[in-house]
């Protein structure tokens, strides 16, 4: 029974398993059918997708084109809005322009003009016919605004520009000359910057306005000093020699330097760097023209009083050259203008060197009479005084000397091809040239020319060589003294050999009379006679005793002739007008030539009149005293 139960259980399980298998098979069949349906749907969907893609592709491209077109339309609408905006805001900007920069405020005014300019540029770029009237209105407003800016620029500038200032107030107190206030400079600079940035041709107009306003201020401030420079050159005495620093040109130049540098600072603060030079030169032009006129007047005065006022030309040359250098260093401008103004005076200064030499030569040549006592003439001291005065202007003269070259003052000197249109710089000078050395050569040439001319005249106009010798020696001594007692000594101390040569020549001319006197002191000594002189002491008594009557008469005659000639020489020597040094030199030279001869002759023959003094007027002591008196 248990077996049966077991078999029945197994059968039931099998039936249940078969039933489950049948169910699974049924589900699998349904799944297979469903899969086939899905695959069929996918195939249809793929076919449909391809059809849709074929249709949607062109639609997508068209959509993109429509999007771009839409964006373009939006941009056009925005541009139209912007183009309409200036027209809409024109009334507001016009109100600002009409009010002007003073009331509206410069920054607001400039911003308004800039907006108008930007709007006009955009309208011109669009070139829409509908905007033509608006563009015309904007152009009119901009033109009016620029005109008001120029007027405001001039108004501000004139408001801060006095008619003139008193330069001496700033010079004497060592104060800087006034410049424009910083707030006004800022306003002027803003206006100029706008004009330059907008490429408006008003920049040149503003520069013209600036020069037109500030130029007369500079000229008026310097006018009195220019007049003073001319007036102080006028002479109360025609023969008065110009003294350094007595003309007003130094103060004039000092004021010009201060005013010009202050004005240059103004120009640099207002205008662009590339415009500084042109505007500064234009502003200073009137003052420079006045200075040039002043220098021409002074030059005419100097040329008409060259002997006494040539030194003013040297001083002016130094002053203006220094002014040019300072302004060139500070501004880089005006060198050419100042050189052109100085040129007439500088040329006069250069030519004066040769002209003064020629004038001295002419004065020597015109001498018709010379002092009969050999006294010096004023021309000698006048010539040396001129050289002494020149030393006081050694710096400008050194510059001129280098410019004309060594010997350039001589009549036949070449011009060396140097240009005279500019103030000389170091580059224009000969390398190694020494202006002081060249000037010393000029001094020596002057002295040599003077002495040569006087020597020739003395030979013609004076009665004797002795008087000519006195005259020349006096001249030499005066020249030497005036060199040694002045600043000329530093230049000529070791170069006065020519004076020593002329002194010896003059001494020889004067003491030539000693030859005539010495003839009376020569005797004939016969060495072949028994009474010839011995080497021991001279015995006058024995010598006289040994003379024959004819020889004694000759000795007496020699004493007599010597006495007369010697007294005459002493008398004339004392009558001559001699400088102390000349009298000493001549007296000593005569003593050296005659005293030894006379003492020898006296030693041998003084017993000829046995001490009566009839023939032997002087013994050795008395004649020594006379010789000593000649030198004192």
Swiss-Prot record:
Coiled-coil zones: none
Pfam hit, one: Exo70_N
Key words of the record: Exocytosis, Protein transport, Transport
GO biological process, one term: protein transport
Gene3D superfamilies recorded: Exocyst complex component Exo70
A single cellular component GO annotation: exocyst
Superkingdom assignment: Eukaryota
Example of a GO MF term: phosphatidylinositol-4,5-bisphosphate binding
InterPro entries: Cullin_repeat-like_dom_sf, Exo70, Exo70_C
Keyword Transport belongs to the record: yes
Keyword set includes Amino-acid biosynthesis: no
Localization terms from the record: Bud; Bud neck
Predominant place of localization: other
Family: Belongs to the EXO70 family.
Role played: Involved in the secretory pathway as part of the exocyst complex which tethers secretory vesicles to the sites of exocytosis. Also plays a role in the assembly of the exocyst.
Stated name of the protein: Exocyst complex protein EXO70
Organism: Gibberella zeae (strain ATCC MYA-4620 / CBS 123657 / FGSC 9075 / NRRL 31084 / PH-1) (Wheat head blight fungus)
